[in-house]
Amino acid sequence: MRRKAASKRLTLTDQRFNDEIIYRLINAVMIDGKKSVATKVVYDAMDIVGEKSEESALDVFHKAMTNISPVVEVRGKRVGGATYQIPMEVRAERRVALALRWLKKYSESRSGKSMATRLAAEILDASNSQGSAVKKREEVHKMAEANKAFSHFRF
């Protein structure tokens, strides 16, 4: 018999922007528990974003997150010995988690001096619907569209 589902923990907010998603980005960027370093990287990146765009850094970041977040994804399901890629809608929490993961991954793979400049460049590109993270989202959506025929196999 299944136990009760774990309750969602309260997400804290960061000090400067008072935003939950920025706090989660700081945690995603953090390496070896060095939160102060991660905080500095994210805040420096946000400063660069603020300088390079007319809008506020937070607005640009949220626009970028919207452009990166996937709406549908494919998940594998075994049916009679064959594994089908079934398109599924992505839950809101997973959407943010995937967007943050892709933002970090493709920022790291960029060429540039500091992580702050690479992160800022990826955020600016994503807010303009460009960059590797947006490309990844389009790729995921394309896979879901290609496997639309299997959407009747629900979980």
Curated annotation (Swiss-Prot):
Gene3D superfamilies, alphabetized: Ribosomal protein S7 domain (1.10.455.10)
Keywords tagged on the record: Ribonucleoprotein, Ribosomal protein, RNA-binding, rRNA-binding, tRNA-binding
BP term (GO), one: translation
MF-aspect GO terms: rRNA binding; structural constituent of ribosome; tRNA binding
Xref: InterPro entries: Ribosomal_uS7, Ribosomal_uS7_bac/org-type, Ribosomal_uS7_CS, Ribosomal_uS7_dom, Ribosomal_uS7_dom_sf
The organism's place on the tree of life at top rank: Bacteria
A cellular component term, taken from the record's GO annotations: small ribosomal subunit
Statement: the UniProt record of this protein carries the keyword Metal-binding: no
Function field: One of the primary rRNA binding proteins, it binds directly to 16S rRNA where it nucleates assembly of the head domain of the 30S subunit. Is located at the subunit interface close to the decoding center, probably blocks exit of the E-site tRNA.
Subunit-level organization: Part of the 30S ribosomal subunit. Contacts proteins S9 and S11.
NCBIfam families: rpsG_bact
Similarity comment text for this entry: Belongs to the universal ribosomal protein uS7 family.
Protein name per its UniProtKB record: Small ribosomal subunit protein uS7
Gene that encodes the chain: rpsG
